[in-house]
């Protein structure tokens, strides 16, 4: 791919998982509201391609966006307990600003980092904790309506809806990735819910690489590894994006140790 890929929120965990996997595979532009330390920037990325800016800054966003082919939009307030004024500014207004700039400069693909919190209220007391265990039949597949568990989840559902609007009215390809529980090296320890929605760094990088490479219109997919215990379906991500996850929380003990070492 000759044109750059813009990655917002590049210094966060998801951004670092992506860059750790495919940091040398693309011509990146990186944007974060905080200066990135050298270890967070791939060697192949020139300092002129690193932007320190807020996604609500229209001028900065458009400068960073100019000439890019694809956008991976991660930036925002990631706190589940974030108050409304913060999610409104950073997650909703900021995402709208990103979409608006993207269509103005002719971006072809836009991958939006949604969240499990956009559907967290499906985890009702009559379903939990059984739904976190292997062989339970309950599945969310991306066709269900949002059911947020907090205001952060509301903001992510709003981002998905913004994507629907911009796809329908401006023909930009949009994929919303409802990210599960991203941890490095091993699944969350002694946490059934986290192990059911575990996303490894390796699979995270691969999934967003698929978002850059695949052809799609408007999609909602789940971002988890191929866990035995799961209540999110990854069938759509496999079929549309070519996602082929390699990791499985069942390959670790409940305490997070690899089974072949336990």
UniProtKB/Swiss-Prot annotation:
To which pathway does this protein belong? Carbohydrate degradation; pentose phosphate pathway
In this protein, the active site sits at 152
Catalytic activity as recorded in UniProt: D-glucose 6-phosphate + NAD(+) = 6-phospho-D-glucono-1,5-lactone + NADH + H(+)
Indicate the family of this protein: Belongs to the NAD(P)-dependent epimerase/dehydratase family.
- Name of this chain's protein: NAD-dependent glucose-6-phosphate dehydrogenase
One Pfam family per UniProt: Epimerase
Q: CDD domains under this entry?
A: SDR_e
SUPFAM superfamilies cross-referenced by the UniProt entry: NAD(P)-binding Rossmann-fold domains (SSF51735)
Q: What start-end ranges are recorded for coiled-coil regions in this protein?
A: none
**EC number from the UniProt entry:** 1.1.1.388
Q: Which UniProt keywords apply?
A: Carbohydrate metabolism, Glucose metabolism, NAD, Oxidoreductase
Q: What Gene3D superfamilies does its record include?
A: NAD(P)-binding Rossmann-like Domain (3.40.50.720)
Across the pH scale, how does activity change?
Optimum pH is 8.5.
The gene for this chain is azf
**Annotated GO MF terms:** glucose-6-phosphate dehydrogenase activity; NAD+ binding
Q: Does the keyword Oxidoreductase apply?
A: yes
Q: What does this protein do?
A: Catalyzes the NAD-dependent oxidation of glucose 6-phosphate to 6-phosphogluconolactone.
Q: How does it assemble?
A: Homodimer.
Q: Give the residues the record marks as binding NAD(+).
A: 90, 115, 152, 156
| Summary of the knockout phenotype | Deletion mutants do not grow on glucose.
Q: From the record, give the cysteines joined by S-S bonds.
A: none
Enzyme superclass (EC): oxidoreductase
Tell me where on the tree of life, at the top rank, the source sits.
Answer: Archaea
The processes (GO biological process) annotated in the record are: glucose metabolic process; pentose-phosphate shunt, oxidative branch
């Amino acid at each position: 791919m000759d044109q750059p890929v813009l990655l917002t929120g590049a210094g966060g965990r998801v951004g670092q998982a992506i860059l750790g996997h495919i940091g040398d595979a693309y011509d990146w532009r990186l944007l974060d509201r905080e200066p990135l330390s050298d270890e967070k920037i791939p060697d192949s990325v020139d300092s002129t391609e690193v932007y320190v800016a807020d996604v609500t800054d229209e001028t900065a966003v458009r400068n960073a966006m100019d000439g890019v082919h694809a956008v991976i939009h991660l930036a925002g307030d990631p706190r589940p307990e974030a108050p409304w004024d913060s999610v409104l500014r950073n997650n909703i207004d900021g995402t709208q600003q990103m979409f608006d700039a993207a269509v103005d400069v002719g971006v072809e693909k836009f991958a939006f980092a949604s969240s499990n919190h956009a559907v967290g209220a499906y985890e009702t007391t009559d379903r939990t904790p059984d739904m976190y265990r292997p062989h339970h039949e309950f599945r969310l597949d991306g066709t269900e309506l949002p059911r947020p568990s907090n205001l952060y989840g509301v903001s992510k559902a709003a981002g998905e809806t913004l994507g629907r609007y911009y796809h329908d009215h401006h023909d930009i390809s949009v994929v919303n990735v409802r990210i599960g529980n991203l941890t490095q090296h091993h699944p969350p320890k002694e946490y059934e819910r986290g192990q059911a929605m575990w996303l490894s760094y390796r699979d995270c990088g691969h999934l967003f690489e698929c978002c850059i490479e695949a052809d799609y219109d408007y999609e909602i997919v789940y971002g988890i590894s191929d866990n035995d215990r799961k209540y999110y379906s990854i069938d759509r991500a496999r079929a549309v994006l070519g996602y082929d996850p390699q990791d499985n929380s069942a390959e670790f003990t409940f305490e997070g140790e690899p089974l072949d070492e336990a």
